[in-house]
């Protein structure tokens, strides 16, 4: 007789579908909310990932995908989505001056005002737990007084003409300063229906909107009479001449527009960007190659030494040599920054005492680059040493015994047996190390911050900058504003370069070993 296993309440289909339905409603609400806020990419990403997840976990036929989905979702969320966003930004003028939408930039301009009409001296007088606002016309000497009010939010105060000011003690400057934000939200309406607002800590003035918006989108400056029209090529309201051509004046803030491949064109045509870009690209490749070669060479030699049978105290040497790998890299980098200090660093003190020289590690381009490679070799060799120590165990001792019978020495054994047998399994890891060092932002940012700086460039660039740190400086340290669009274009080029170099390296090594 078959035994029917009773399900617990938390295993019931009704509960499962109820939870899935609630999650679906929640996701739908979030997607609509993102769409309404204009976050279209986030809305699409949330819709795709959540829909796929609900389908996989609700359908028994996709049971095997439940183990793969978290990894795929993580890759999509943290790798593919940022990549798509970066590429999308690269085709816009998104920057510190062009962050807003057209509607928001237009509203900011329409909210601006200028001082027009009379200026009145004002005072605050206590009225129990509330206050009264008093205005005095400096030309006629007339006084105007409001009813009692409390601070908080936007409000209009109707003022009436009065013969004398209240007899209480007038609020001092400290009280006015403390309530300045609340006073800025007050509009005082005079008996003739004219309106004045706070213009300084002691005065209220009449104001008018600085710009008037026409039905055709034309913006007119009410002070100067200059007319502006939105220029969707540059993302600014730009002045227009009498003949309808564009003038030189642009109104800030601008708005974000799609500009096509202009950012990519700037990289290759603007000499202020082109020269440092290609120079930095060459240095980035050289830095990555030298780092891989030196870390592998040092790590392999040290691995062979600590595996030497005749060496005593091998365990102690292994621990000491692995220490640079155990210490967090950012701590080691900052320590080396102090050691290489040109005036007080221990390295220059030793070089001065022994050889009478004090290299300019941070101001000379060549010595700065040498310092970067030295520090990165120190940080990277323990990883390669650990890999080589494991791979050396796989080399049969018979090969070394046979070479000893032929009279081969240690150097011949290393170059004829050890090196060829280690290089093949190390190749994929060397390619990964090359890709990592191609984007080694932390080292450059903490050690040299890209310096020494290059002269004659339109973007901030230094002699030790890698492409990734150069991109960061364009995005966040630009003197003329943070140019996120240009930085995204360079980041896209870096992605394509690293991908192309990795493919070329993999194909080259495959052809070599086949």
From Swiss-Prot:
Coiled coil: none annotated. Gene3D superfamilies: D-maltodextrin-binding protein, MBP, MalF N-terminal region-like, MetI-like. It is found in: Cell inner membrane. This is Maltose/maltodextrin transport system permease protein MalF. Residues 281-505 form the ABC transmembrane type-1 domain. One of its GO terms (biological process) is maltodextrin transmembrane transport. Residues 37-39, 93-283, 342-369, 436-483 are periplasmic. Part of the ABC transporter complex MalEFGK involved in maltose/maltodextrin import. Probably responsible for the translocation of the substrate across the membrane. The complex is composed of two ATP-binding proteins (MalK), two transmembrane proteins (MalG and MalF) and a solute-binding protein (MalE). The chain crosses the membrane at residues 17-36, 40-57, 70-92, 284-306, 319-341, 370-392, 413-435, 484-506. Pfam families: BPD_transp_1 (PF00528), MalF_N_TM (PF20872), MalF_P2 (PF14785). It comes from Salmonella typhi.
